[in-house]
Structures are given as structure tokens and as C-alpha cells.
């Protein structure tokens, strides 16, 4: 309401400070991975729901959970590194274990843990029937991603 929006999708990012939460970003759109997470976990089409709302229709609510889903962007080790190489065989194996994945860094790229999530080596979406299976699958993919990237101090 503070932005004048009364319908549609919004994406707001907060940081928690000693003084309390602070809004750092407000967007008139859904957040980066929300569409894929809802589609894979509930079979829900968020884009359709947004379109229905824009047309003045009440969108159907998401149905029950069909699968557990997580979007993961593993952070690199603490410090400044350069990507010396990427083992495409291992990275392909990692992404074959995920529902979807992409590398965010390539050989020669600088990786600096101080810059936050833009330092992520890759991003991927995993799903599973149970929470335990989801965590196991996420751990497997994450381990392979870290094996695939060769980092050297920058």
C-alpha cells in the first residue's frame, strides 16, 4: 500500500539491522525463483494468477504441496578468488541430479564473498518427495558444484 499497489505480485527485500528491519528493494514483480518453486512444488502457475488478477478475476489459490522444492545458490568460500577452471563433466553430473541448474561463473571470473549472492558459483532447483530427501539431494548437488569449480586466490 505504501507504494500505491493494491493488486498484483510484489517482491520486497529486507535486511535486519539492530534498529529493526529495513526495506532495501521493492519491486512490482514476483521474486527471482518464486515462479519455478511454486510450479514444481504445487503445480501452480503464478504468471497465470498475476494475469487473472490484472483482468480483475480472483486467481485460483495454490493447491496442496505435491513435492518439496528448493532454489539453491551456494556461496563460495570466504575471500577473493578467481575461477581457474570448471570441470564440465562434474558440473553436468551436478545439474543432472537437479531439476534445473546453471553456472553463474566461468573461468577467469572474480569471485568475492564480500559482494553477497552475486558471488554464487551456480544456481539450481531441486525437488523431492520429502524434506529429508530434498536436503539429501541438495547436499549432493552442492558437493558436486563445489568439486566442479577450481578456485585460486585472487
Predicted regions and their residues:
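Active-site "cap" helix and flanking loop/linker of ATP-utilizing ligase/carboxylase catalytic domains
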Residues: 1-12, 18, 27-82
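Peripheral (often C-terminal) accessory segments that flank ATP-dependent C-N-forming ligase machineries
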Residues: 51-154
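Conserved protein kinase catalytic/activation segment
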Residues: 20-22
Amino acid at each position: 500500500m505504501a507504494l500505491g499497489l493494491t493488486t498484483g505480485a510484489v517482491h520486497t527485500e529486507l535486511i535486519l539491522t539492530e534498529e529493526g528491519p529495513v526495506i532495501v528493494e521493492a519491486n512490482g514483480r514476483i521474486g527471482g525463483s518464486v515462479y519455478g518453486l511454486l510450479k514444481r512444488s504445487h503445480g501452480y502457475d503464478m504468471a497465470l494468477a498475476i494475469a487473472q488478477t490484472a483482468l480483475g478475476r480472483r486467481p485460483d489459490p495454490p493447491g496442496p504441496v505435491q513435492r518439496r522444492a528448493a532454489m539453491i545458490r551456494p556461496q563460495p568460500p570466504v575471500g577473493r578468488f578467481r575461477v581457474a577452471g570448471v570441470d564440465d563433466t562434474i558440473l553436468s553430473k551436478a545439474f543432472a541430479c537437479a531439476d534445473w541448474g546453471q553456472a553463474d561463473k566461468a573461468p577467469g571470473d572474480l569471485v568475492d564473498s564480500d559482494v553477497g549472492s552475486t558471488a554464487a558459483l551456480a544456481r539450481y532447483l531441486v525437488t523431492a518427495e520429502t524434506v529429508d530427501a530434498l536436503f539429501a539431494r541438495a547436499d549432493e548437488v552442492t558437493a558436486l558444484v563445489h568439486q566442479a569449480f577450481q578456485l585460486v586466490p585472487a
